[in-house]
């Protein structure tokens, strides 16, 4: 585990809804990149027995928060980026017991950023795609 991953785990453990209630784990962090994991349980399912959209969105939201603030973690600065808006496309369901969210940075500017968060199962099957725009808190 890298020191950046460890630092992100320490900082974002305070995102208690994502980490304690939902059970999301921070797996890997690099500059502008985060990978988070969610082991699926019955509590993550909707009335139809499918994965609840909110569980997938929470997974993507935490991955975005970590990736967009990764440079702050590297430089030991306070967190500076928050979500301004997101869209989610549900691409399919999975029978797998693990969801993985991985970020890709589209733009990391001085006042706004855009990230795609790809959610797939542990076998690589695409489950959702989230696009999130963030804003720097100084703006």
What positions do the PLM features span?
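Terminal targeting signals and extreme-terminal segments of soluble enzymes
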Residues: 1-139
């Amino acid at each position: 585990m890298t020191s950046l991953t460890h630092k992100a785990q320490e900082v974002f453990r305070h995102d208690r809804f994502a980490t304690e209630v939902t059970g999301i784990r921070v797996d890997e962090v690099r500059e502008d990149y985060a990978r988070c994991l969610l082991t699926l349980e019955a509590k993550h399912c909707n009335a139809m027995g499918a994965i609840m959209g909110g569980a997938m969105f929470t997974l993507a939201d935490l991955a975005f928060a970590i990736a967009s603030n990764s440079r702050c973690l590297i430089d030991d600065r306070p967190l500076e980026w928050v979500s301004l808006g997101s869209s989610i496309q549900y691409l399919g369901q999975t029978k797998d017991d693990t969801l993985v969210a991985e970020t890709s940075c589209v733009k990391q500017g001085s006042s706004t950023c855009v990230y795609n968060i790809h959610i797939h199962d542990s076998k690589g099957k695409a489950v959702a795609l989230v696009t999130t725009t963030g804003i720097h808190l100084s703006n």
